[in-house]
């Protein structure tokens, strides 16, 4: 860590401090992830500042370990190339952008449920409700609604995926070893693979992971780097 540039180092330190602060606060009955995590915008728990604070909170040790390792591995290179101010701007903006994409995703996930729930309340004699081709009991749909409204999004993953996107765009032919792959893979193929994987998981999976927030970070990162390349200034080099 001695050779890690300042913004990268401080981001890792802040995330670790927030992680342990959440553990300590929980012992006193305070759920910091619930306070600082990003809630759905129609929830009574939503606060605008959560679009910033959510990216410093994590759900578990593995979650923060992966994210901070990626920040250290790729972020220090980007900060060296861009400088601390531009790297911090990129990190924060893409993290906020990922949060906005997550909010929009939840809105479209929530909209058909609420529409069909309203129809059910009009004709409450039905034992189950078909929504988007899936039939569940009223209690199950209520549980889904409660999850969307009450469970916050936490983690630096949106910003981390933006960092991966930036690395892949700036160093597309750099070979990277990824466990458990037996051979190195070029950064450009790694980024494409991650994008396709996250898109597929976001559409097909119900694993509780904010896949579209990951995609949002990548998309915001891509657009920002393309803007910098168009504007000029050497922030989007190829190698």
Residue ranges of predicted features:
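A detector for small-residue-rich transmembrane helices and their helix-helix packing motifs
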Residues: 1-239
């Amino acid at each position: 860590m001695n050779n890690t540039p300042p913004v990268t180092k401080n981001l890792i330190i802040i995330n670790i401090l927030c992680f342990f602060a959440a553990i300590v606060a929980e012992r006193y009955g305070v759920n910091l992830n619930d306070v600082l995590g990003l809630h759905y915008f129609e929830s009574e728990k939503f606060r605008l500042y959560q679009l910033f604070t959510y990216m410093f909170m994590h759900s578990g040790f593995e979650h923060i370990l992966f994210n901070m390792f990626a920040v250290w591995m790729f972020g220090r290179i980007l900060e060296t190339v861009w400088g601390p101010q531009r790297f911090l701007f990129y990190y924060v903006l893409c993290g906020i952008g990922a949060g906005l994409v997550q909010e929009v995703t939840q809105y479209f996930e929530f909209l058909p449920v609420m529409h069909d729930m309203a129809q059910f309340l009009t004709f409450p004699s039905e034992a189950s409700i078909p929504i988007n081709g899936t039939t569940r009991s009223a209690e199950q749909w209520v549980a889904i609604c409660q999850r969307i409204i009450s469970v916050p999004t936490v983690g630096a993953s949106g910003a981390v995926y933006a960092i991966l996107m930036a690395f892949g765009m700036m160093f597309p032919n750099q070979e990277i070893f990824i466990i458990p792959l037996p051979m190195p893979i070029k950064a450009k193929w790694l980024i494409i693979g991650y994008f396709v994987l996250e898109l597929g998981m976001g559409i097909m999976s119900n694993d509780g992971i904010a896949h579209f927030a990951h995609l949002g970070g990548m998309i915001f990162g891509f657009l920002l780097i393309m803007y910098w390349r168009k504007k000029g200034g050497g922030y989007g080099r190829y190698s």
